[in-house]
Swiss-Prot record:
It is found in: Cell membrane. Keywords: ATP synthesis, Cell membrane, CF(1), Hydrogen ion transport, Ion transport, Membrane, Transport. Its main location: membrane. Belongs to the ATPase epsilon chain family. It comes from Mycobacterium sp. (strain KMS). The gene is atpC. F-type ATPases have 2 components, CF(1) - the catalytic core - and CF(0) - the membrane proton channel. CF(1) has five subunits: alpha(3), beta(3), gamma(1), delta(1), epsilon(1). CF(0) has three main subunits: a, b and c. This is ATP synthase epsilon chain. GO terms for molecular function: ATP binding; proton-transporting ATP synthase activity, rotational mechanism.
Amino acid sequence: MADLDVDIVAVEREIWSGKATFVFTRTTSGEIGILPRHIPLVAQLVDDAMVRVEREGEEDLRVAVGGGFMSVTESGVIILAETAELESEINADEARRDSESDDPATAARGRARLRALGQID
């Protein structure tokens, strides 16, 4: 099966780089799934996005993403995020607390983190 080269990079660090069979996320135009050999595009991610990376023979990788862009070429996907956290790095209680914040940016970050944990859609 064909693979995508996927790079997820936040302002402060590289989050993940590797091979995937499918990438799913939410953009300002709606939800999108990327398979190998997808048409090229550039899309803006929503502020409370979750990126799901499906990998052959491995568990899905879930990343909470706070804003940024996605670039798709025939061979791969690059996610350039303002903030990003792997599911394994997220504290559920803190994410829930943040999602209820009066500050819109903090609330969006909390929702993205809860999506990565699979606790909200």
